[in-house]
Amino acid sequence: MWSRNVRLLGSWTRSYMVPATKRKTIPVYPPVQRIASSQIMKQVALSEIESLDPGAVKRKLISKKNKDRLKAGDVVRIVYDSSKCSYDTFVGYILSIDRKQLVQDASLLLRNQIAKTAVEIRVPLFSPLIERIDLLTPHVSSRQRNKHYYIRGTRLDVGDLEAGLRRKK
């Protein structure tokens, strides 16, 4: 009895398996020829920067070659174009200047204290909403660092900058 069942099991085939009758061939194509790079992104960036900053004023503000450039530690006022947006002017201490590979992506990180609350804002430098950037107070020469992140929450932290400027006048 047992030997009869073994013979029957050996002759069964699985119903989901289909026997292969011929070999599959997968076509292999030659590699695509590379076209010489024409630096399209650089050309687009140059045309875009000319429309965003026609007088090169903002480029001079962050240029490392310019002696009167913005540096970490400066106090600046960002004035927005009132016809394009409803933002108020913002006075802030520059914590860092982020220069990117494409110049038009550069931004400023500003810090101020408003109603006893520390506020940080990242301002894209070449935004069409910005009318002008005024330098109010140059940096303190004793803090010569590229980034001033270390002042957060210490005695060096900024107070209410607008109130301080009003008191100086």
From Swiss-Prot:
InterPro entries xref list: Ribosomal_bL19 (IPR001857), Ribosomal_bL19_sf (IPR038657), Translation_prot_SH3-like_sf (IPR008991)
TM regions (residue ranges): none
Transit peptide: first to last position: 1-16
Keyword Ribosomal protein: yes
Location in or out of the cell: Mitochondrion
Main location as per UniProt: mitochondrion
Protein keywords: Mitochondrion, Ribonucleoprotein, Ribosomal protein, Transit peptide
Superkingdom: Eukaryota
Molecular function GO terms recorded: structural constituent of ribosome
GO BP terms, alphabetized: mitochondrial translation
Pfam families tied to this protein: Ribosomal_L19 (PF01245)
GO cellular component, one term: mitochondrial large ribosomal subunit
PANTHER family (alphabetical): LARGE RIBOSOMAL SUBUNIT PROTEIN BL19M, RIBOSOMAL PROTEIN L19
Miscellaneous field: Present with 4150 molecules/cell in log phase SD medium.
Subunit structure comment from the entry: Component of the mitochondrial large ribosomal subunit (mt-LSU). Mature yeast 74S mitochondrial ribosomes consist of a small (37S) and a large (54S) subunit. The 37S small subunit contains a 15S ribosomal RNA (15S mt-rRNA) and 34 different proteins. The 54S large subunit contains a 21S rRNA (21S mt-rRNA) and 46 different proteins.
Function: Component of the mitochondrial ribosome (mitoribosome), a dedicated translation machinery responsible for the synthesis of mitochondrial genome-encoded proteins, including at least some of the essential transmembrane subunits of the mitochondrial respiratory chain. The mitoribosomes are attached to the mitochondrial inner membrane and translation products are cotranslationally integrated into the membrane. bL19m is essential for respiration.
Family (UniProt): Belongs to the bacterial ribosomal protein bL19 family.
Name of the protein this chain belongs to: Large ribosomal subunit protein bL19m
